[in-house]
Structures are given as structure tokens and as C-alpha cells.
Amino acid sequence: MKLSWNSIKVSIAGAKLSHLVQKDKIWDHGSMTEQARTIFFKVQRAKNAGAIEDLKKYLTAIGYEKLKKEIDGLERMDKTWIIKNPVIKEVAVIEVHPAKNNKPDGFIALIKGRGIFLITDKNKPKELIGHSDHIHDFSIKWNFIRQGDWWLLDVIN
């Protein structure tokens, strides 16, 4: 059996979650990973369209502003995202942070998958011919924080 740092982190987070979910159902592992998966696809669609206004209800104010700056920066350079066929292979909760010292509850999700992700000139056609060399495996960490009875995306790493 191959042990990795991430598998150890998943085990530790899982142990914490099993205790936390008994006190509050928001800590349900399945709901947390599904929320991460859902928001991932919404963010990718919004980046592809270059319009993130619909994401406000899924991101913290800080997370929304960071994403908006990224999109605005691309606009100023006449660039755009091309995101096609993203496939998630795994979503794992790797860290759990119960509320402490005026910081809200939070968790970090590791999202692994594969897809076409590239930034190109806005005026170029968005054909996928020749983009097969842009298919990449990805592994990203997203920080979520609790707001009421909901998890919001705060930071994309």
C-alpha cells in the first residue's frame, strides 16, 4: 500500500469530521465534497464565459474579488480562458478547521482531475483543433469557509 502525505491528511481530516458531524450536520463529508464539486464546475463555466456575476452566492467577498481581478486582468490583455471537458477524478477533504479565535469553520478540498485549460487571445477562434496538447491533469486546493448553513469558496490555490 502506497502512503502519501495527502492520504495521511485525508485520514486525519476524516477522523475530525466523524466527531464534528455528530455536533453539526454541516460537517457531513458527502455534502462537503459535493459542494466543492458543484462550485468547481460553476467556476469553470463562468471562467469560460468570462462572466462571474452568478458566482457571488458561492464565493466569499474576498474570493469573488480575487476571481474578478483575474478575469479583469485577462480582459485588459485581450485574453480569454478556454476550458473544455473538465473531469473530476477525486475530491478529498484534506484539512478541517472548526471555528476558533473569531475565524469561521472551514475546510480545504483537494480536487484532482483532467481537462483542457488554456488562456488565449480573445480574437482567435475557440476551436479545439490543435488543443489536444493542452489536456492536463490538475490538482488544486480550494479553501471553503462556513457562512450560516453553507460552505463558500474563499481561496483557490
Label every model-predicted segment.
Residues 1-38, 42, 121:
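Juxtamembrane and targeting peptides
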Residues 21-27, 52-59:
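Short, exposed beta-strand "edge-strand" segments with a Pro/Gly-rich flavor and a Y/T-containing core
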Residues 38-41, 45, 53-157:
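Structured, amphipathic secondary-structure segments that form assembly/contact surfaces
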